[in-house]
């Protein structure tokens, strides 16, 4: 068995190293005779350990079990409440503890003072500014590091260098923590006043970040970067990450492009050997020098030195070090400010009357025209989504907070909740539901605030608006996004696009006479000057649209939307400041509306168009592309002569002056070769991503359990690794060991084995081989998968009680009645299930389900019972196929050039052989005709699971399903009678299988699955027309080949002679595949 189990048993003997500690392995087998031996073996182990006898003779006696059965879990038993961490830590605490500079940050509480100096008493204390918000403790993290160090203390050669580097860095951490003692966490993994009062306030979050950084050290450069960040982030909790990552916006403009990929007319990336020289005016170098000086000012030495050394020849080869520094800077942890400072930051902007009114006017008009353009067609055609906008809003209502806690009665049960969906049900039940009235958010009813924390930026505030705002905006915004989907300017929403094509989009037009202007407008989006022109533009657009229709329902939808904008122009917010809640007038735009993303994009587009129209008064150029992506916008301008330093200098200064005329505090840059925006950056014709996901600190506490967080940790590790920031895998596995263990009693713990955590069951947490998703097909794997299926869905008493209450039932039937023309059990049941699922975000229900699941899991981890079901898993389908596959060694030449330098070697190799994918594989079923037919007449959106179920029904039932959703009978019967229906059957099955095989996640999303190079390695004789079977055989063959290539950097070809007699059987089986949701899949989804 794999490396995980080895690390597991070593880790257990490392942590529980006393005489009294016992570890009992538990095995299982799908073979009933061997299973009996497994049970005997376990019983005797328990017996021996009770008598204090050695387990060694049993391992001899039961060699058949240890050789042939599968390890299920390890039961660990230890008397001593261990303060082992402190004891072990002392031997590493040989260095000088760090001393915090208590004047390093502007805001007093951001200095790393002793907690009792920041908070005089337990009442005043809050951990919200330093809460790691992750369900694992500092002591576990220290244990994991010391375990790694102990395991590798005898490494030789290069491995020994890594050991020494990490040991040296850990000495700093250990010495500092040892000075104050290891802070003990409570059962919720929080650090209370009593524990923290005599320790530096930021000790825990700093130590977590430092551990994450030191366990990501491999080379000498890593060591220098990490050391500097670890030492300085102990004092500087505010600006360090920002200062370290600032230079990147200029560095991208310094490298010549020598060969790059461009997007061609067919929306594919193709190589172009063009050469573009980086033309850099002196002023740019001055700005860069100033950034470097600012870095030196706060005590950085090595990082600015590395940047300066790179500047000598600005080579692309050595640029990876620059991108490394850029990624590392985020790992110092989140900057968490007090809400009052986060809010006042946006209120402090001085408002000047001296602005260019003409430009503001143009800006407002552009917003107005864009809104009209986006909504014109749906409004003129009286689109059903706009007519039923309220219903559409209710169906997609989230279970997020509604801003206030309320007492709600469900039948006999009374609960307190802040959730939107529960408030809606409550209001409907009491006749207080008035979607036609948008509640004011003025001084009488100020908006409660949420927060968003990011490394290297200030904390931002989020409006928590009443649900009426969501209902009013939902349908209209959906229509706006639909327009954005086929408008290239909106890089985020553009349907055919992805990060790679957007990259080829820019490089396509770069040449000696083109410059690219890129601006970060995040400050502008939340500035006060933006709010009046912004909201007014939207309001004017909506007024124009109202005159284009006579349908009262559409007019009503537009009017409600307009009302949200009017209300928000006079908005007040509640800001907690200590124990008081302050009311402040808030003039800026904040996230929290449904329209945030769409409206910001529209405004950014209007802004850059306004700027370009001013520049055009002075220069003659053609605008080749304009793109907006979130807070960033960029444009490529083509001039009729070659560019000179002076031209770039002039354009740059003019652009800045224009922004200044609008009092927009933005960072505008001009370059000839590269850009840097929040999501990605382009340098030397290659594309880079920032690998800045924190592993051991989280932004906020959600209601995910330790298992979920272990899966998220692994998923974050994978994303960072693909982007060029690698953390030691053994360390990650050790964290998974810690976070997935289940306590039975104080001294008894159960540790699941690799098989449990990597089989795709409801408990999957990670992959045994990075980047490769395995679908186990052996008897033992399928057996354990079936065993876990039985305990996937747990009941919750509270949820059942709520669901059986009149309040809940009335709400569900209200939705069904509004949605359906005639009875439709599938949809009504679907709505009820969806609404019941929304209840999961209510903590008591979640906890109840989780407890039930953990206790079932405990039973299962000690003795699995396989479970009979008529559902198949994808594993069983693949198990039927596998025996007919014959593989032989083969080879593929490297034929594509690198364009993403940060990728790990094995992934890079596969892409260079088969090419990269520039399209999303459709895995939602939305391209099928039935899905399009439904969306033409109804606001209801069936999930891929529902479509999969419906499309396999009898034709009569499908027709009834369609008619009940408002599809006219003639369309429905025409659909069932046509050939399209059988094509749909195939399309939906295809989407469903893609969805199950996570083809759009991890590194699979980078590979071209339709690559002709890949196809030629597969030989499957064609036998009769069952396209679905042909499809799954091909897909499985491709996965086998790609997985083999990732693992071995070598290629195989696959021959499959699938018997015709088996094909029908397989085809029937393919219509009863069940989807498995696990912490692993939700972590993948969460990455999205």
From Swiss-Prot:
Its main location: virion. The lineage of its organism: Viruses, Riboviria, Orthornavirae, Duplornaviricota, Resentoviricetes. The keyword Cell inner membrane does not apply. Its cofactor is Mg(2+). GO terms for cellular component: virion component. GO terms for biological process: DNA-templated transcription; viral genome replication. Its EC number is 2.7.7.48. Belongs to the reoviridae RNA-directed RNA polymerase family. It is found in: Virion. Residues 501-687 form the RdRp catalytic domain. Interacts with VP3 (Potential). Interacts with VP2; this interaction activates VP1. Interacts with NSP5; this interaction is probably necessary for the formation of functional virus factories. Interacts with NSP2; this interaction is weak. Keywords: Magnesium, Nucleotide-binding, Nucleotidyltransferase, RNA-binding, RNA-directed RNA polymerase, Transferase, Viral RNA replication, Virion. GO terms for molecular function: nucleotide binding; RNA binding; RNA-directed RNA polymerase activity. The keyword Protein transport does not apply. It is an enzyme of class 2 (transferase). It catalyses: RNA(n) + a ribonucleoside 5'-triphosphate = RNA(n+1) + diphosphate. This is RNA-directed RNA polymerase. It comes from Rotavirus A (strain RVA/Human/Japan/KU/1995/G1P1A[8]) (RV-A). RNA-directed RNA polymerase that is involved in both transcription and genome replication. Together with VP3 capping enzyme, forms an enzyme complex positioned near the channels situated at each of the five-fold vertices of the core. Following infection, the outermost layer of the virus is lost, leaving a double-layered particle (DLP) made up of the core and VP6 shell. VP1 then catalyzes the transcription of fully conservative plus-strand genomic RNAs that are extruded through the DLP's channels into the cytoplasm where they function as mRNAs for translation of viral proteins. Transmembrane segments: none annotated.
């Amino acid at each position: 068995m794999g490396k995980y189990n080895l690390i597991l048993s070593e880790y257990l003997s490392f942590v529980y190293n006393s005489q009294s500690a016992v570890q009992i392995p538990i095995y299982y087998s799908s073979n009933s005779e061997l299973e009996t031996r497994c049970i005997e073996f376990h019983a005797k182990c328990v017996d021996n350990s009770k008598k204090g006898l050695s387990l060694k003779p049993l391992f001899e006696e039961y060699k058949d079990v240890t050789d042939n059965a599968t390890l299920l879990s390890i039961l660990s038993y230890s008397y001593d409440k261990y303060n082992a961490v402190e004891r072990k830590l002392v031997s590493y605490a040989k260095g000088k503890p760090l001393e915090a500079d208590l004047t390093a940050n502007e805001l007093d509480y951001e200095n790393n003072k002793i907690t009792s100096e920041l908070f005089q008493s337990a009442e005043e204390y809050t951990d919200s500014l330093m809460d790691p918000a992750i369900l694992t403790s500092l002591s576990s993290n220290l244990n994991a590091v010391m375990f790694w160090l102990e395991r590798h203390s005898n490494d030789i050669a290069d491995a020994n260098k890594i050991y020494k580097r990490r040991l040296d860095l850990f000495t700093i951490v250990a010495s500092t923590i040892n000075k104050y003692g290891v802070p003990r966490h409570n059962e919720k993994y929080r650090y209370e006043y009593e524990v923290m009062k005599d320790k530096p306030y930021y000790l825990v979050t700093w130590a977590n970040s430092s551990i994450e950084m030191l366990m990501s050290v491999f080379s000498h450069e890593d060591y220098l970067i990490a050391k500097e960040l670890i030492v300085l982030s102990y004092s500087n909790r505010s600006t360090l990450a920002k200062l370290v990552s600032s230079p990147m916006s200029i560095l991208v403009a310094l490298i010549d492009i020598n060969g790059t990929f461009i997007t061609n007319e067919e929306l594919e990336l193709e190589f172009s050997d063009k050469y573009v020289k980086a033309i850099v005016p002196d002023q740019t170098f001055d700005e860069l020098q100033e950034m470097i000086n600012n870095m030196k000012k706060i005590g950085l030495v090595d990082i600015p030195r590395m940047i300066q050394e790179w500047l000598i020849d600005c080579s692309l080869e050595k640029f990876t070090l620059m991108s490394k520094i850029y990624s590392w800077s985020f790992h110092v942890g989140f900057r968490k400010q007090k809400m009052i400072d986060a809010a006042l930051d946006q209120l402090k902007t001085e408002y000047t009357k001296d602005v260019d009114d003409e430009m503001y006017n143009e800006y407002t008009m552009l917003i107005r025209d864009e809104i009209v353009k986006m909504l014109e067609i749906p409004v003129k055609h009286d689109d059903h989504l706009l007519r039923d906008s309220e219903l559409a809003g209710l169906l997609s209502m989230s279970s997020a907070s509604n801003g206030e806690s309320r007492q709600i009665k469900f039948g006999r049960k009374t609960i307190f909740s802040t959730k939107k969906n529960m408030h809606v049900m409550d209001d409907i039940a009491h006749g207080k539901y008035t979607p036609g009235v948008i509640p004011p958010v003025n001084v009488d009813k100020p908006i409660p605030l949420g927060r968003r924390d990011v490394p290297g930026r200030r904390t931002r505030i989020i409006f928590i608006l009443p649900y009426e705002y969501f209902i009013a905006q939902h349908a209209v915004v959906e229509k706006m996004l639909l327009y954005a989907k086929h408008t290239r300017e909106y890089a985020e929403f553009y349907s055919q696009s992805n990060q790679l094509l957007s990259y080829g989009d820019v490089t396509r037009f770069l040449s000696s006479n083109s410059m690219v202007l890129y601006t970060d407008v995040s400050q502008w989006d939340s500035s006060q000057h933006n709010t009046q022109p912004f909201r007014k533009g939207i309001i004017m657009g909506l007024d124009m649209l109202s005159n284009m229709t006579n349908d009262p329902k559409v007019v009503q939808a537009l009017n409600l939307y307009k009302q949200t904008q009017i209300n928000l122009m006079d908005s007040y917010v509640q800001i907690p400041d200590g124990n008081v809640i302050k009311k402040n007038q808030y003039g800026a735009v904040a996230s929290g509306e449904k329209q945030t993303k769409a409206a910001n994009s529209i405004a950014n587009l209007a802004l850059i168009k306004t700027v370009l129209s001013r520049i055009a008064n002075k220069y003659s150029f053609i605008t080749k592309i304009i793109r907006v992506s979130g807070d960033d916008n960029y444009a490529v301008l083509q001039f009729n002569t070659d560019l000179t330093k002076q031209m770039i200098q002039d354009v740059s200064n003019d652009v800045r002056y224009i922004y200044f005329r609008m009092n927009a505090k933005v960072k505008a840059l001009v370059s000839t070769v590269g850009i840097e925006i929040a999501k990605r950056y382009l340098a030397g014709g290659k594309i880079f991503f920032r690998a800045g996901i924190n592993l051991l600190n989280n932004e906020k506490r959600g209601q995910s359990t330790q298992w979920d967080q272990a899966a998220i940790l692994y998923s974050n590790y994978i994303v960072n690794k693909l982007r060029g920031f690698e953390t030691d895998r053994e360390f990650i596995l050790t964290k998974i060991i810690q976070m997935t263990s289940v306590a039975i009693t104080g001294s008894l713990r159960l540790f699941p084995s690799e098989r449990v955590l990597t089989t795709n069951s409801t408990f999957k947490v990670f992959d045994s081989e990075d980047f490769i998703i395995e679908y186990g097909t052996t008897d033992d794997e399928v057996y354990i998968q079936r065993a876990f299926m039985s305990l996937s869905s747990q009941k919750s008493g509270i949820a059942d009680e709520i669901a059986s209450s009149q309040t809940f039932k009335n709400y569900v039937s209200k939705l069904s009645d509004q949605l359906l023309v005639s009875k439709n059990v599938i949809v009504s049941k679907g709505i009820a299930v969806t609404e019941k699922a929304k209840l999961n975000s209510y903590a008591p229900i979640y906890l109840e389900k989780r407890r039930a699941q953990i206790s079932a899991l405990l039973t299962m981890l000690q003795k699995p019972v396989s479970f009979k079901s008529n559902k198949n898993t994808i594993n069983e389908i693949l198990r039927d196929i596998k025996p007919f596959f014959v593989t032989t060694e083969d080879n593929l030449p490297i034929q594509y050039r690198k364009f993403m330098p940060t990728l790990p070697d094995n992934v890079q190799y596969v892409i260079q052989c088969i090419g990269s994918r520039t399209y999303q594989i459709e895995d939602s079923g939305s391209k099928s005709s039935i899905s399009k037919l439904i969306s033409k007449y109804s606001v209801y959106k069936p999930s891929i699971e529902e479509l999969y179920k419906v499309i396999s029904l009898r034709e009569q039932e499908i027709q009834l399903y369609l008619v009940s959703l408002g599809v006219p009978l003639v369309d429905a019967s025409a659909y069932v009678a046509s050939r399209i229906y059988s094509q749909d059957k195939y399309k939906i099955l295809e989407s469903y299988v893609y969805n199950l095989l996570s083809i759009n996640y991890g590194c699979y999303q980078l590979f071209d699955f339709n690559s002709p190079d890949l196809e030629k390695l597969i030989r499957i004789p064609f036998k009769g027309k069952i396209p679905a079977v042909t499809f799954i055989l091909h897909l499985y063959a491709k996965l086998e080949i790609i997985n083999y290539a990732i693992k071995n950097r070598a290629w195989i070809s696959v021959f499959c002679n699938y018997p015709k007699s088996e094909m029908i059987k397989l085809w029937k089986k393919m219509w009863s595949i069940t989807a498995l949701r696990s912490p692993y899949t939700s972590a993948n989804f969460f990455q999205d």
